[in-house]
């Protein structure tokens, strides 16, 4: 189904509210973290112009970090907030809100992988590369080697599965829901985020605990809840994106039925995933040590923190700015890349 057919249905759309039966929290450092995050983004020239800067200010990514990692030490929380603003902007500018593929796509994405692999930037860094290197070096200094590699592997998979997402948008018709779920699980950026959840609470869990099947299943359910809820909440923006617009709701609509019915189908899946997450979380917690309980708590903070951020803090997905925020093609020019090179 072409997005031109779906866009007129947006104005009458009724979006659900999601509820989880555990309390949220927020770091007391939220305002300071947010302000320093903006200063950091300015330092690395991530904000291309005044309009771009205003978009970031109203998104409040530092508040997302404060809600998802409320117990994190201030230094770690600041790195996470800086990572958030970099990731949202890079994901928009490299993948989501530009042409499906351009002459810079491979250069941009491989540069991000190289920073992880070599702990250095290229001779002619692309936009955001030096900021990304700074985030990685600060995280390396705060985490042990194996926990950092969990984060790094999540980011490598973000950059590589972005290629699968691009392939899906080159096709005249989307892949099915199962294939989409695989792509979404990794392009969302949730895996690197949840990889920091234990360190932000009671410390990093041991590898043999982190990779146990039930723990990994719990991480995947947390990932699914946030991703699929976001597919509903960001729908008004994503449908208007020039290159990447097929999410779970849109794919269900392509298979037949109205956009409203597709929202309700996706919402039912989110609710079912929340129930499954709760059941599995109880089972894992029953035999967990202190650090593993911290990971489970961290996943809960992420789910609730994201939902509270959308409801109370951010303007990233509101209708008022959807049309203008959905298109970054005016930013993705050779002049921008050259401006941020050193």
Swiss-Prot record:
Mg(2+) 1 binds at residues 91, 96. SUPFAM superfamilies: Terpenoid synthases. The record marks 88 as: Plays a critical role in the stabilization of intermediate cation. Mg(2+) 3 binds at residues 230, 234, 238. Signal peptide: none annotated. Its cofactor is Mg(2+). It comes from the Eukaryota. One of its GO terms (biological process) is isoprenoid biosynthetic process. It catalyses: (2E,6E)-farnesyl diphosphate + H2O = (+)-corvol ether B + diphosphate; (2E,6E)-farnesyl diphosphate + H2O = (+)-corvol ether A + diphosphate. Mg(2+) 2 binds at residue 96. Coiled coil: none annotated. One of its GO terms (molecular function) is metal ion binding. Belongs to the terpene synthase family. This is Sesquiterpene synthase MBR_09977. It comes from Metarhizium brunneum (strain ARSEF 3297).
